[in-house]
Amino acid sequence: MSMANLLLLIVPILIAMAFLMLTERKILGYMQLRKGPNVVGPYGLLQPFADAMKLFTKEPLKPSTSTITLYITAPTLALTIALLLWTPLPMPNPLVNLNLGLLFILATSSLAVYSILWSGWASNSNYALIGALRAVAQTISYEVTLAIILLSTLLMNGSFNLSTLIMTQEHLWLLLPTWPLAMMWFISTLAETNRTPFDLAEGESELVSGFNIEYAAGPLALFFMAEYMNIIMMNTLTTMIFLGTTYNAHSPELYTVCFITKTLLLTSLFLWIRTAYPRFRYDQLMHLLWKNFLPLTLALLMWYISMPTTISSIPPQT
């Protein structure tokens, strides 16, 4: 793995993340009958870079009562994990070809909980701590359904390797035979990334800004960068699992174009949901998971396990 390969992966992700922030502000603006950012550069296209310059040149203030080490480590860890999640994704070739790529993504995304918990605790603020506890409970809860849904799709894929998902979906998207799982997966990714209508961790009316309330300047920017990278990564993963694109060695650029288009459409749906839906109550959020999603996903998992046995066949051993 050369440095050039690493840069060719990281730089486009950072650019995509910057323009996702701008796109969200534009969509929010137009949905509220206003223009959104339109001053810096043509049509406001340079706004993300202006924001980055402003945030990274400001003085990073630290509360005098905070635990400095964890306070600084938390945003850095959040961004590192957000970037690390991209390494096994085949687009069409992965940076690191892991046999257990899906397991790596699931395990690494669980580590993001620590950055949220540390930031809430180290800030020494009640608002930040309550926001962090909410975010951690929500993230851990929804990872249960994400893991079960992944296991169900892996039974049809026959491997933990993400590259084999491309071969599995050559003739049929997994979205069609597993559409209930796909719907629950998409809603769970909204909760996993703390997006509306599941953004209880940063409820402005009761918690001001949630776990990052005491952060300013560069560290705050790192949290936002990690959040938007996770959104793109989750939609990329959704595209791979349920909307697989057939790879043709003679025209690899066609795979990339189709892949990016599907990911962009799913990301736009994330933003559209933010503009259209109000926030859930916290008890409704937890009931949706433990009383609805968990029994449903377990029942469907049993169905996908028993079905090959019933029809006397086995999943493809790729």
Curated annotation (Swiss-Prot):
GO terms for biological process: aerobic respiration; mitochondrial electron transport, NADH to ubiquinone; mitochondrial respiratory chain complex I assembly. The lineage of its organism: Eukaryota, Metazoa, Chordata, Craniata, Vertebrata. It is an enzyme of class 7 (translocase). Pfam families: NADHdh. It comes from Gorilla gorilla gorilla. HAMAP family: NDH1_NuoH. It catalyses: a ubiquinone + NADH + 5 H(+)(in) = a ubiquinol + NAD(+) + 4 H(+)(out). Core subunit of respiratory chain NADH dehydrogenase (Complex I) which is composed of 45 different subunits. The keyword Translocase applies. It is a multi-pass membrane protein. This is NADH-ubiquinone oxidoreductase chain 1. GO terms for cellular component: mitochondrial inner membrane; respiratory chain complex I. PROSITE patterns: COMPLEX1_ND1_1, COMPLEX1_ND1_2. PANTHER family: NADH DEHYDROGENASE SUBUNIT 1 (PTHR11432), NADH-UBIQUINONE OXIDOREDUCTASE CHAIN 1 (PTHR11432:SF3). It is found in: Mitochondrion inner membrane.
